[in-house]
Amino acid sequence: MLARFPLYLRLIRMDKPIGSLLLLWPTLNALWIASDGHPAPSLVVIFVLGTLLMRSAGCAINDYADRDFDRHVKRTAERPLTSGKIRAWEAVAIAVGLALVSFLLILPLNALTKELSVVAVFVAATYPFMKRFFAIPQAYLGIAFGFGIPMAFAAVQDTVPALAWMLLAANVFWSVAYDTAYAMVDRDDDLKIGMRTSAITFGRYDVLAIMLCYAAMLGIYVWVGVTQHFGWPYWAGWAAAAGCSIYHYTLIKDRERMACFAAFRHNNWLGGALFAGIAAHYALSAL
């Protein structure tokens, strides 16, 4: 069992934290905004751990769902499940176990948060299968990656206001942007095996679609800043995030595989800039 532990860590992408960070930033944004910059430490711990656990569970179930496809994709052919180093039932067991631990974390929270968690688990578990049917599965991914947003508002305010759904919409646009760049890396392989991705759907308009999604996401955050009366620290963070999106254009415009992958990874800085602006606004407002 101990000898297989490194394989399990690879299955849940513990060696690749970028996915966890892309989930974490929008969740932290929601926690800070919902609590006016003063989230309870216990809530921060619960949502950070829950995000990490559910992302790991999602990786395991994704590899289970895609195991017959991944062996035909250069980037994924050596994943533990695809290469036969672990079995399908092990991946399912790990995913279920991580989801159960994540649910245990929210037991102290209110009923609305628990109800939303059921929806969150359903969306996360079904996302890998959406790639067979949806032309832009990355939009579904945005809902799965962003469901911590309404849950955060529910945990703090015991309601989910329109603001939370706007933040979730922003996350959908952001997810389509960064995951389309990611899908551009695998586009040739995905075309051969019949996988549906936004990079394939957008075709020669892929770069334009990515930049429009960035613009939509940043536009929603302008609305958030105006309606919440955020100060200059927020707008500095917003400007840094906008600068990141422009930098990503320079990486993806020639559609070179490794540059597209670099753009995907760099979205961590875009998300971090927005959260830094939100946190700094509340911190300075409290002085």
From Swiss-Prot:
Domain of life: Bacteria
Keywords on record: Cell inner membrane, Cell membrane, Magnesium, Membrane, Transferase, Transmembrane, Transmembrane helix, Ubiquinone biosynthesis
UniProt-listed Enzyme Commission number(s): 2.5.1.39
Catalysis: reaction(s): all-trans-octaprenyl diphosphate + 4-hydroxybenzoate = 4-hydroxy-3-(all-trans-octaprenyl)benzoate + diphosphate
Names of required cofactors: Mg(2+)
Membrane spanning stretches: 30-50, 92-112, 133-153, 158-178, 207-227, 232-252, 267-287
Presence of keyword Lipid metabolism: no
Disulfide bond positions: none
Biological process annotations from GO: ubiquinone biosynthetic process
Pfam (any one): UbiA
Topology with respect to the bilayer: Multi-pass membrane protein
Gene Ontology terms for molecular function: 4-hydroxybenzoate polyprenyltransferase activity
Pathway, per record: Cofactor biosynthesis; ubiquinone biosynthesis
EC class name: transferase
A cellular-component GO term for this protein: plasma membrane
UniProt name for this protein: 4-hydroxybenzoate octaprenyltransferase
Organism: Burkholderia thailandensis (strain ATCC 700388 / DSM 13276 / CCUG 48851 / CIP 106301 / E264)
Gene symbol of the encoding locus: ubiA
